[in-house]
Each structure stands twice: as structure tokens, then as C-alpha cells.
């Protein structure tokens, strides 16, 4: 599975082998990036992740797989999956963020991960502006 997340002025396209690995990774990100937001999730493998990274201009890379947030990267993600949002890029990612948060809350509401649930159960504060 592929994920697209944003944390402050940075974003990342990543891969997890399955939902369990993804949720584990998100718990880790929450420890070190307390304001990250999930922009989108899609089926995909390591090759898909590498292909998307190949389309991202080198000047947008910050460190490792983290990039400086730019709507060009969001458009690369949409183009790769052949997504043409009818209401615009911002509305698409806002709705996908809400859906991802709801899925996480449903999956973890009966577990001891209280802080994890508390974080994703709040109304989205997704900010897609460019600084």
C-alpha cells in the first residue's frame, strides 16, 4: 500500500507492505511528527513508490524521501493514479484525509492506543498551502 502524508512544510510518498505495517508506521510518525496528516492511500507496491519518486523533481527533495511541500508533488500523485478530482486538488485531499482518519479511528477504537485515536478523531486541520 502507498501513502502520501504531509507534515508542516514537508511531504512524503511511502510504501507499507500491508495495513498492519502502515498503521504501525503511522504510530511511529506520530511520535516524531505530531502534526502530520494523511493525504491519501492507494494500493501499490515498492515499484509504484519508486516510480512516483522518479517523477518528483530533485530540487523538491529535502532529506531522504521527505520533500518540501509543493502542489506539484500532489499533482504527480494524482496523475500517477489517473485521478482527476472534479472539485479540485484541495477538496480531493481533504476528503481523502477525513476518510483515512475515520478508518484509523474505527480500527483502533477498541485498542490501548488512546493517543493515536485521539489524534485522528479530531476534525482535520489539513493545510495544503505552500509556505
Say what each PLM segment does.
Residues 1-130:
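Non-catalytic accessory segments flanking enzymatic or RNA/DNA-binding domains
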Amino acid at each position: 500500500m502507498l501513502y502520501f502524508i504531509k507534515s508542516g512544510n514537508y511531504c512524503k510518498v511511502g510504501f507499507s507492505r500491508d495495513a498492519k505495517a502502515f498503521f504501525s508506521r503511522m504510530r511511529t510518525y506520530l511520535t516524531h511528527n505530531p502534526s502530520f496528516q494523511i493525504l491519501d492511500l492507494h494500493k501499490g507496491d515498492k515499484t509504484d513508490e519508486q516510480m512516483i519518486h522518479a517523477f518528483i523533481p530533485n530540487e523538491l527533495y529535502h532529506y531522504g524521501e521527505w520533500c518540501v511541500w509543493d502542489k506539484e508533488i500532489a499533482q504527480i500523485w494524482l496523475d500517477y493514479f489517473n485521478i482527476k478530482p472534479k472539485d479540485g486538488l484541495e477538496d480531493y485531499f481533504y476528503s481523502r484525509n477525513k476518510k483515512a482518519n475515520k478508518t484509523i479511528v474505527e480500527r483502533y477504537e477498541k485498542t490501548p492506543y488512546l493517543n493515536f485515536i485521539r489524534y485522528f478523531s479530531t476534525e482535520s486541520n489539513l493545510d495544503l498551502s505552500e509556505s
